A protein has these predicted regions:
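Positively charged n-region of N-terminal signal peptides that target proteins for export
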Residues: 1-4
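Enzymes and membrane/adaptor proteins characterized by extended Gly/Ser/Thr/Asp/Glu-rich
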Residues: 65-75, 84-205, 227, 232-246, ...
Length: 385
């Protein structure tokens, strides 16, 4: 009898405990949902108050050299840079190894840039680990050296890498990292991707990429899944010319899309679109960056990505050898690209988008949606208040 009474009491207490746990989970979910609603409302309010020129400017991330006429790598802030950023209201600046000399210089440059603006911006860098590490490969920065992603096989290590990189990036003032690489390496001849990929297993690539996303964003640094729709099955280098993937849509759904789905499931803030053509999917050689079917139809609609879609650098050979900066900018925006990275000529690209809105070539709703996505992430990461 005593055993029965004890068992009943245990069941009651356990049941109460479970109810409390469920109640706490419900409270946390409710708080998260409320926070998301507030961010949504605030983002809409900010976007509604922006001029069309300010909205268009938010859609560009450029190098600081775009505003500097010395012909030298920018390592210190100048009035020209501040004036240029404010003239175009750009959404972000990307720094490369040439801009990053040592910690204090980097912090001062970033703080000076942010302190000169009406709208706070993304400060971006390519910091994947391995051979693509603008900071990690600079001995003066004194940060942990991260192995190539091809060597990462443990989800705990992947998350740790995200935390490590996110920590030193945020301490320096960066808030956007063009990482992780979510490409599945299905063609070993692909040296452009090579050991930047987690390998040829789509599920493993997805698991590792998702954990790095979580680690980076835990430290307040936006992650970028790249290079959609999947650059691991190409042989040529899109920095030099147009790359082509022979994959069919079924192939991509079964392999290439898997890491992106998993990274999106981990709530990656960004996805980067690649300058590769997929003729068996689109029917022509249009780069994915300029394809509405790929960017809007597949990435945003089929995969349900609600964050920011950024192009790969618009000054790469795949684009500049086939399109002018104005034409490429308009096509990319209409395809669904939210941020244009490093156009060959900022003034031409900016004015092409601006004029495209005014003459109806670009729907106003497309610009509003892009700007809303951008501002929402800036609010989420505390870049905007």
């Amino acid at each position: 009898m005593k055993k029965i009474i004890i068992l009943i009491m245990f069941m009651i207490l356990t049941g109460c405990g479970n109810k409390n746990e469920i109640k706490n989970d419900n409270i946390e979910t409710s708080v998260t949902a409320e926070s998301q609603r507030e961010e949504t409302d605030q983002a809409k309010e900010i976007v509604n108050k922006m001029t069309v020129e300010e909205k268009v400017g938010q859609m560009f991330i450029v190098m600081p050299e775009a505003f500097d006429n010395t012909g030298k790598a920018v390592t210190v802030f100048s009035d020209n840079i501040g004036e240029g950023i404010n003239k175009y209201n750009v959404g972000g600046i990307i720094l490369f190894a040439k801009n990053i000399k040592e910690p204090e210089q980097t912090k001062k440059l970033i703080n000076s840039i942010q302190g000169s603006l009406k709208y706070p911006i993304f400060i971006a860098v390519d910091e994947e680990g391995g051979r693509v590490a603008r900071i990690g490969n600079n001995q003066n920065m004194k940060v942990p050296v991260i192995e190539p992603m091809a060597q990462v096989r443990d989800s705990n290590r992947a998350y740790e890498i995200g935390l490590i990189i996110g920590t030193y990036l945020s301490e320096l003032g960066f808030n956007l990292d063009f990482a992780p690489d979510a490409d599945v390496l299905t063609d070993k001849r692909n040296i452009e991707i090579g050991d930047r990929s987690f390998g040829n297993n789509a599920e493993l690539c997805g698991q590792m990429a998702a954990e790095i996303v979580k680690g980076l964003q835990q430290k307040g640094v936006s992650a970028v899944l790249k290079h959609f729709p999947g650059h691991g099955g190409t042989e040529s280098n899109s920095h030099e010319g147009l790359s082509e993937s022979k994959k069919t849509l079924e192939d991509m759904r079964n392999v290439e899309f898997i890491p992106f789905k998993m990274g999106i499931g981990a709530e990656s803030d960004f996805v980067m679109a690649a300058h590769l053509s997929v003729p068996n999917v689109t029917g022509d050689n249009t780069p994915a960056t300029l394809s509405k079917y790929i960017i809007t139809g597949l990435l945003k609609n089929e995969l349900g990505f609600k964050g920011v879609v950024v192009s790969d650098a618009m000054n790469m050979g795949a684009i500049v050898e086939n399109y002018g900066p104005d034409e490429a900018a308009v096509k990319a925006v209409n395809a669904g690209i939210d941020i244009l990275l490093m156009p060959e000529n900022l003034d031409s690209a900016y004015n092409a988008v601006l004029n495209g809105i005014k003459n109806g070539e670009i729907p106003k709703e497309r610009i509003d949606d892009a700007c809303y996505r951008i501002v929402k992430i800036k609010l989420k990461r505390g870049i905007m208040k």
